């Protein structure tokens, strides 16, 4: 009965991808716990280290339990939880790609590599197992298609303009962007991942959702979930730096609070517009 119910929105339910949540949680608890409880662990610049510690607090306190709950509910055939789980896995893939490539080498290097690998394959497997046409059929007419597509498209364009405004002058003048100087890394991995992966994904989602294509419905939830977690992490980084004496950039704080609020609101609206089949509800209660 459970397989028949789940097949409506998943082509082939392979819990191997959800089971990767266990090693991810264990590795994440180690990586973030060491960053929090071992002062001076990071060998990076003060600026970069403070951001890393701020993100470690967020990962340890928020991401670990939320990922566990989302995985458990997704295992019990909750499509809403699966979308949130995918968003968190995108966030972790992004975060630990940066840690593995940009952090100064330390005792957790292999942990970063393992986190990146587990998150990446969980993400690929999670998406490959989904039937995008079946998912589209689960959404009602109340789905905020235009609002989400406009928001994601606008966000992508604004961040492209922000990063290019920093990168292009440096390329033309043969200098180094300020963010690269502050982090003490060869390049800014955020520039790389945003402009090559995240921002194109937001644009693809926006265009497909605007035209009510199945791919847009499939990607919108995970991308909104990713933005919620990423904006929250950035705010934790800002708090960490502020506590260490760095000046608080008020416009930046306002921007990320607004991004978090709008993304969370649209994510809730999007998830609430999902039809919950009676069979799904019955099965979830049976699993409980």
Language-model features: locations:
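C-terminal transmembrane-bundle signature of multipass membrane proteins
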Residues: 30, 191-288
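Membrane-interfacial loop-to-transmembrane alpha-helix junctions, especially the N-terminal start
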Residues: 17-19, 75-88, 215-225
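Short, Lys/Arg-rich, polar N-terminal cytosolic tail immediately upstream
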Residues: 1-13
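Membrane-interface helix-loop-helix junctions at boundaries between adjacent transmembrane segments
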Residues: 69-125, 132-143
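Membrane-interface interhelical connector segments
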Residues: 168-185
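Hydrophobic cores of alpha-helical transmembrane segments in multi-pass inner/ER membrane proteins
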Residues: 58-69, 115-129, 196-204, 258-273
